[in-house]
Amino acid sequence: MFPLSGCWRTELLLLLLLAVAVRESWQIEEKSCDLVGEKDKESKNEVALLERLRPLFNKSFESTVGQGSDTYSYIFRVCREAGNHSSGAGLVQINKSNEKETVVGRINETHIFNGSNWIMLIYKGGDEYDNHCGKEQRRAVVMISCNRHTLAGNFNPVSEERGKIQDCFYLFEMDSSLACSPEVSHLSVGSILLVIFASLVAVYIIGGFLYQRLVVGAKGMEQFPHLAFWQDLGNLVADGCDFVCRSKPRSVPAAYRGVGDDQLGEESEERDDHLLPM
């Protein structure tokens, strides 16, 4: 009885430890973006955009602005908690003079949309204003612009709009290649002509080779189509270059020709008689 009771106690203790471990793992699991609206009615386009930004989930971006007592640091993460991990903040502002942390936007109220070369990520549900914007909750608007040369960078605050009664926001910008639309490669006219020319040359060589071998019955180099023409091509090119490029006129053959001794007849001595003195 006693050994059996001790065994049961050990098993219960192990189950209790396992339950505590599972509970702790659930608690420390990082939160992710929760789109505005009901879970089963989320926009497929927004879900696809968040999946597109997944390579940035494990990155943290920080930027510091101002000087003196008005120096603020902004920490931003994509679909991950920034700053105090229990706050659910996606973007926080830290006052460097007193290290006070203000939540600008939370990831549990995320809205996202895009254009041809940009993505707009919005975190709502930040800490309430004290005396501005009707004491509404803060909101962070991050403009992610296309930059094909970097995965992510150049995170900077642009401005804070708090002069209105409502719909105030903090505006930020950053660069990322993930915001770029896919490049569509088009063949140029020259490339198309080159492909056509290469295809015609291949058809000419293969077709001519088969014809020479199967129909004519040629062997060896004679199987190459129009072999005599290609062998004489160099001379033809040289003649054409000589005809087109040379500016010096060609030597014109003489209009007369020499006469050989065998073509000369015997001259009569009477031809010179009139030269003798009388």
Swiss-Prot record:
Annotated glycan sites: 58, 84, 95, 108, 114
Intracellular or extracellular location(s): Lysosome membrane
Segments traversing the membrane: 189-209
One BP annotation, GO: lysosomal transport
A cellular-component GO term for this protein: late endosome
Residues recorded with modification Phosphoserine: 268
Cytoplasmic compartment segments: 210-278
Start and end residues of each MRH domain: 31-182
Domain of life according to the entry: Eukaryota
GO MF term (any one): retromer complex binding
InterPro entries in UniProt: Man-6-P_rcpt (IPR028927), Man-6-P_rcpt_cation_dep (IPR000296), Man6P_isomerase_rcpt-bd_dom_sf (IPR009011), MRH_dom (IPR044865)
Membrane topology reported for the UniProt record: Single-pass type I membrane protein
Signal sequence interval, chain numbering: 1-21
Chief place of localization: membrane
Keyword list, A-Z: Disulfide bond, Glycoprotein, Lysosome, Membrane, Phosphoprotein, Receptor, Signal, Transmembrane, Transmembrane helix, Transport
Side of membrane Lumenal, spans: 22-188
Disordered as annotated region, ranges: 256-278
Bridged cysteine pairs (disulfide): 33-79, 133-168, 146-180
Complex formation: Homodimer. Binds GGA1, GGA2 and GGA3.
Purpose of the protein: Transport of phosphorylated lysosomal enzymes from the Golgi complex and the cell surface to lysosomes. Lysosomal enzymes bearing phosphomannosyl residues bind specifically to mannose-6-phosphate receptors in the Golgi apparatus and the resulting receptor-ligand complex is transported to an acidic prelyosomal compartment where the low pH mediates the dissociation of the complex.
Note: This receptor has optimal binding in the presence of divalent cations.
Domain comment as written in the entry: The extracellular domain is homologous to the repeating units (of approximately 147 AA) of the cation-independent mannose 6-phosphate receptor.
Name of the protein: Cation-dependent mannose-6-phosphate receptor
Species: Rattus norvegicus
